[in-house]
């Protein structure tokens, strides 16, 4: 197959065309069915987490080890010498790029991954999250999970709940699903955490249906995917947070009118926004979603680092 992802930076989901997304999803399914433990043998990949992470970092590292590659790097940028010495991000990336075949980066500054790509000496950059901006590999595993559970990425009704203003996962997911035809979006959030206008304007420009709703109950019988996110306490004043915490919680009783095919996703960590009782329903899919991150990240790593694939 033609591999247009070879040596490509994975900075934003917007950098990937629909056919490239489909290429990653097909490769993800292939690797889930048939492991390829030596696919990236002799490759060395840097894992540079300037911001703390558990799931994303461990998922990437597991993907790397299962492909036979080696990994170097750090998991807490605040405790490494380059931060204490005041070295710039660009200098750090320039040096690290001379050691490795690719760099995974998470950084609190928006735009940091694209900046890193300018100084990586043509070594591919994988964005593992840059501030509130983008988280493309989370989106790839989300798409893989949606396709796996719904057998399609078109003609879906998707409800997205929680922090839609600062949540980079929901921005990337909406942009990705907008590449596929006839999807509809239902946005549910506190007024202070509404989806940014640039996302709404993008949907309007593409003539894609979207609407704000006040609660999950209003739309539970209409949706195929319920994508929950946590509301961060520091984003709201105490009164707003108390109201949001009670209003935007998914309880098992709400699911009585759900479609049989409906699945609940969450980028994790889950705090209070999904009751533990929901875990035992057939709709709960967030832990299987997290497990799919290994296959999606294996797929994108291998497609970027190896030109020819069967």
From Swiss-Prot:
L-aspartate binds at residues 85, 168, 230. HAMAP family: Asp_carb_tr. Keywords: Pyrimidine biosynthesis, Transferase. GO terms for cellular component: cytosol. Its EC number is 2.1.3.2. SUPFAM superfamilies: Aspartate/ornithine carbamoyltransferase (SSF53671). It catalyses: carbamoyl phosphate + L-aspartate = N-carbamoyl-L-aspartate + phosphate + H(+). PROSITE patterns: CARBAMOYLTRANSFERASE (PS00097). Catalyzes the condensation of carbamoyl phosphate and aspartate to form carbamoyl aspartate and inorganic phosphate, the committed step in the de novo pyrimidine nucleotide biosynthesis pathway. This is Aspartate carbamoyltransferase catalytic subunit. It is an enzyme of class 2 (transferase). GO terms for molecular function: amino acid binding; aspartate carbamoyltransferase activity. Carbamoyl phosphate binds at residues 55-56, 106, 135, 138, 268-269. Pathway: Pyrimidine metabolism; UMP biosynthesis via de novo pathway; (S)-dihydroorotate from bicarbonate: step 2/3. Heterododecamer (2C3:3R2) of six catalytic PyrB chains organized as two trimers (C3), and six regulatory PyrI chains organized as three dimers (R2). Transmembrane segments: none annotated. GO terms for biological process: 'de novo' pyrimidine nucleobase biosynthetic process; 'de novo' UMP biosynthetic process; amino acid metabolic process. The lineage of its organism: Bacteria, Pseudomonadati, Pseudomonadota, Gammaproteobacteria, Enterobacterales. PANTHER family: ASPARTATE CARBAMOYLTRANSFERASE, ORNITHINE CARBAMOYLTRANSFERASE, MITOCHONDRIAL.
């Amino acid at each position: 197959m033609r591999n247009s992802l070879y040596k490509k930076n994975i900075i934003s989901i917007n950098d990937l065309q629909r056919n490239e997304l489909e290429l990653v999803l097909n490769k993800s399914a292939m690797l889930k069915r048939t492991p390829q433990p030596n696919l990236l043998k002799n490759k060395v990949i840097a894992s540079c987490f300037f911001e703390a992470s558990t799931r994303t970092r461990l998922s990437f590292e597991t993907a790397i080890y299962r492909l036979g590659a080696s990994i170097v790097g750090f998991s807490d940028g605040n405790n490494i010498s380059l931060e204490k010495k005041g070295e710039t991000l660009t200098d750090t990336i320039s040096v690290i790029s001379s050691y490795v075949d690719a760099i995974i980066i998470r950084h609190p500054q928006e735009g940091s991954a694209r900046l890193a790509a300018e100084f990586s000496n043509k070594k591919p950059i994988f964005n593992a999250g840059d501030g509130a901006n983008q988280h493309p590999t989370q989106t790839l595993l989300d798409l893989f999970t949606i396709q796996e559970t719904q057998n399609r990425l078109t003609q879906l009704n998707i409800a997205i709940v929680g922090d839609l203003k600062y949540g980079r996962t929901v921005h990337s997911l909406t942009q990705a699903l907008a590449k596929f035809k006839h999807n509809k979006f239902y946005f549910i959030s506190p007024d202070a955490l509404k989806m940014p206008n640039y996302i709404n304007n993008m949907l309007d420009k593409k003539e894609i249906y979207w609407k704000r709703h006040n609660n999950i109950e209003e739309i539970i019988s209409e949706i195929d995917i319920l994508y929950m996110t946590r509301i961060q306490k520091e984003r709201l004043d105490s009164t707003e947070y108390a109201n949001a915490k009670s209003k935007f919680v998914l309880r098992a009783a709400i699911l009585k009118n759900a479609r049989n095919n409906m699945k609940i996703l969450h980028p994790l960590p889950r705090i209070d926004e999904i009751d533990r009782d929901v875990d035992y329903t057939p709709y709960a899919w967030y832990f299987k979603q997290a497990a799919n991150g290994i296959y999606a990240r294996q797929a994108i790593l291998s497609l970027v680092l190896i030109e020819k694939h069967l």
